[in-house]
Amino acid sequence: MNVGLVAIVENGQVILNIIKIMTLNEKIYKIVSKIPYGKVATYGQIATLCGNPYYARAVGNALHKNPNPQKIPCYRVVNSNGKLTENFAFGGLRVQSDLLISEGIEVIDGKVDLEKYQWRG
């Protein structure tokens, strides 16, 4: 997390405030950590929740570098068609599939049913 300095002039006095500025990756990790057990989200959905629907690729890049897969369940993120990630960074497609199945999510031909399992957060 980065910090910034904000100066406010009030009644002729300068008041300095230190503010925390969250990086895009930190926003992504925070949102992904909220996806509940037994649910999935799409890259575009996470991007939109970060403030820009065009950040879907950035979401993928951030999750590929996930610093804490136990707390940030990147395996719960799929593409806009519900398809699993071919290049899942933490063991490949089979591991992602197994993790989702262990949460009760049906995976058929490498896809999940978004109507049934998509998080509406």
Predicted regions and their residues:
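Generic signature of intrinsically disordered, low-complexity, basic-rich segments
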Residues: N2-V3, Y37
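Composition-driven detection of intrinsically disordered, low-complexity segments
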Residues: A7, I15-I18
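Intrinsically disordered, low-complexity regions enriched in Ser/Pro/Gly/Gln/His and often acidic
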Residues: L5-V6, V112
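Short hydrophobic alpha-helical segments enriched in small aliphatic residues
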Residues: V3, V9-G12
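Nucleic acid-binding interface residues in structured DNA/RNA-binding domains
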Residues: I18-G121
